[in-house]
């Protein structure tokens, strides 16, 4: 499972992933019997409501999946899946299942990222540029346990100063040219001229410049996956190296390098027990019964007083009878 799960944005370069899938699809179409490591490409993301190009890229991924997944010449060796409504619950299922973690943003554009850390902790091997937290992952696991490709930040800045011309890269790479023209011609009956035009004329995030190196990294990842023992070791190295992203390590760095404070040993005292908090014995429970009895007696007192009051009301009648006898 080759997984790219994150917010959809041009700088995160889902379009670069799509170009590689198209190139592999065209290669298999031309030679259906060639040796090829089967791979399922999984996308999961959301686009901002007003981000037109991001929504078009989602539409392109969906259209491409219908073409590739239903082509009998491919024989299921490439599958493209787009998971809708990406959220934490979906990530909880996708990240443990991932074999390859696509972290392919243009160098110098990603602040850090945390998805790459979660995938690393779940044993996925990072395939990415030296951007954001990929740099720390690379430092933690070493060259042999990660697939790094693409321009570095100083090289990106230098190319921007000189003036980046995407058409130059396109016409110097026949595979890339064919993939871009595939998009330009429309996919599954839908037009994607906006995407192909942007790639050929602007390509702000240099997907075409990194395409050839990205393809090499994809081939290396396929070779590594075929060696099950090697791939398992790479996965374990990523899991064991993920400790650098723990909150404990981060807070310790703050304490040492920014706050300049020393750790304080905190000795937790056992909670003091009191008689009130201790469980009551049978003898302690007896007074409680007496108190309830008194309450019952007090409630019964008003009823007795009510009975005594009844003869007092009858007294005037007796005096009335006596007066009648005297009058006779």
Model segments located where?
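Long, K/E/R/D-enriched contiguous segments that form extended
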Residues: 1-92, 106, 260, 266
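Low-complexity, compositionally biased segments
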Residues: 5, 119, 134, 213, ...
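Hydrophobic transmembrane alpha-helix bundles
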Residues: 33-34, 72-80, 109-122, 267-276
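Structural motif
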Residues: 39-41, 78-80, 100, 125, ...
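Intrinsically disordered, polybasic Lys/Arg-rich low-complexity tracts
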Residues: 271-328
């Amino acid at each position: 499972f080759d997984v790219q799960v994150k917010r959809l944005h041009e700088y995160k370069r889902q379009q670069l992933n799509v170009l590689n899938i198209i190139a592999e699809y065209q290669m298999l179409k031309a030679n259906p019997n060639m040796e090829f490591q089967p791979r399922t490409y999984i996308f999961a993301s959301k686009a901002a409501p007003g981000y037109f190009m991001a929504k078009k890229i989602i539409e392109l991924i969906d259209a491409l999946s219908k073409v590739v997944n239903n082509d009998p010449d491919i024989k299921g060796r490439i599958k493209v899946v787009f998971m809708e409504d990406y959220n934490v619950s979906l990530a909880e299922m996708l990240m443990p299942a991932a074999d390859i973690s696509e972290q392919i943003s243009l160098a110098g554009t990603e602040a850090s990222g945390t998805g790459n850390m979660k995938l690393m902790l779940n044993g996925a091997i990072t395939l990415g540029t030296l951007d954001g937290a990929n740099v720390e992952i690379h430092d933690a696991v070493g060259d042999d346990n990660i697939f790094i490709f693409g321009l570095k930040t100083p090289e990106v800045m230098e190319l921007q100063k000189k003036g980046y011309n995407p058409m130059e890269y396109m016409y110097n790479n026949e595979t890339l040219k064919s993939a871009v023209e595939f998009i330009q011609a429309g996919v599954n009956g839908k037009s994607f001229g906006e995407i192909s035009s942007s790639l050929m004329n602007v390509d702000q995030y240099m997907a075409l410049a990194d395409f050839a190196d990205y393809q090499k990294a994809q081939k290396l990842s396929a070779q590594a996956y075929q060696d099950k023992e090697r791939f398992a070791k790479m996965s374990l190295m990523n899991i064991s190296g993920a400790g650098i992203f723990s909150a404990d390590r981060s807070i310790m760095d703050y304490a040492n390098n920014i706050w300049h404070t020393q750790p304080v040993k905190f000795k937790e005292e056992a909670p003091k027990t009191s008689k009130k908090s201790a469980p009551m014995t049978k003898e302690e429970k007896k007074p409680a019964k007496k108190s309830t009895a008194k309450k019952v007696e007090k409630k019964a007192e008003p009823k007795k007083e009510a009975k005594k009051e009844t003869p007092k009301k009858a007294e005037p009648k007796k005096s009335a009878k006596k007066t009648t006898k005297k009058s006779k």
